[in-house]
């Protein structure tokens, strides 16, 4: 290779790396806020916090990591929480409650002998590292290549050892098949599996959501999926939610507009047509009560953000 070609190749490599980092920065914002909320919750008194994530703070950029450190100063935690709650009403408590809820489903799946876990849109999720009971199962973290690269880089900088049972698989949900990506990374459809699809569906197309749920519905009976979704009434204006208009404006401003939602009243039939049986569906008000009990009475906002859990049915064929 000549000198000129070598210079050109190095330039292209640098540009590709730069573009990857820029893309990672763009798509990591909401994932980072989720990690921030978990890190903030982890600073609370052990007897009061509902979850502990010792890895989340390592994934934050300096300003958010600084806020977590500030929260550990006596008397400052409530102030940091209040500031976060004023900025996006309900986001923090909703995020913590649904993380707790899905954690519980994950732990139950381990006890039931589930052999594979798939994090669809893994982002800065740390279940593969903090829920140690899953060490015997295969775990697949599926997300945009730029997101996975950023996550691995930050974990590496923090000297976090990635468990040997964790595999990373890059995907563009709107353009690639989940089945193809998982198959290429050793996923076995003949084993019961637990899918977690958190904080993703609201960014996709109808076709992409349909394709993923049909794939899950065609997996081994007894497999489950825990997913989050936005009430379609927020998107089309047919329902009103506290703080709803503000959050739509905010996500549009950071170039992460919400594009998809479900009508909760139609979800049972939608899933049944894809060989899935709905086991749980609740908005933030309900799952915050499940998590925080009576303390949830004063928590407001994000009622449009649902968690649903569904199981692959036995002996059924998906409808076309």
What do the PLM-derived regions correspond to, one by one?
Residues 171-177:
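Conserved acidic residues
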Residues 178-189:
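Short amphipathic alpha-helix with an adjacent loop that forms part of the alpha/beta core around
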Residues 220-232:
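Conserved beta-strand signature within the Rossmann-like core of class I S-adenosyl-L-methionine
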């Amino acid at each position: 290779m000549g000198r000129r070609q070598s210079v050109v190749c190095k330039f292209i490599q640098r540009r590709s790396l730069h573009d990857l980092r820029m893309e990672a920065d763009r798509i990591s914002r909401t994932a980072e806020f989720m990690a921030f909320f978990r890190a903030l919750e982890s600073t609370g008194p052990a007897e009061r916090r509902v979850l502990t994530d010792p890895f989340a703070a390592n994934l934050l950029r300096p300003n958010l990591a600084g806020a977590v450190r500030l929260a550990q100063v006596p008397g400052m935690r409530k102030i940091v929480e209040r500031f976060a709650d004023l900025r996006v009403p309900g986001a923090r408590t909703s995020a913590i409650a649904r993380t707790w809820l899905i954690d519980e489903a994950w732990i139950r799946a381990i006890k039931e002998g589930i052999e594979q876990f798939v994090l669809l849109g893994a982002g800065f999720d740390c279940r593969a590292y903090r829920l140690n009971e899953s060490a015997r199962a295969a775990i697949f973290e599926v997300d945009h290549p730029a997101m996975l690269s950023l996550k691995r880089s930050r974990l590496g900088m923090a000297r976090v050892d990635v468990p040997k049972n964790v595999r990373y698989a890059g995907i563009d949900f709107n353009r690639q098949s989940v089945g193809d990506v998982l198959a290429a990374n050793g996923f076995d459809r003949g084993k019961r599996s637990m899918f977690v699809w958190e904080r993703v569906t609201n960014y996709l197309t109808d076709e992409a959501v349909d394709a993923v749920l049909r794939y899950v519905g065609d997996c081994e009976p007894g497999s489950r999926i825990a997913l989050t979704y936005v009430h379609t009434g927020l998107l089309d204006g047919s329902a009103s939610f506290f703080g709803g208009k503000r959050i739509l404006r905010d996500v549009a401003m950071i170039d992460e507009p919400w594009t998809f939602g479900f009508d909760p009243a139609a979800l049972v039939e939608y899933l049944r047509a894809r060989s899935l049986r709905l086991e749980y569906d609740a908005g933030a008000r309900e799952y915050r009560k499940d998590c925080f009990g009576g303390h949830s009475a004063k928590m407001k906002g994000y009622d449009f953000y649902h968690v649903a859990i569904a199981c692959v049915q036995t002996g059924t064929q998906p409808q076309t």
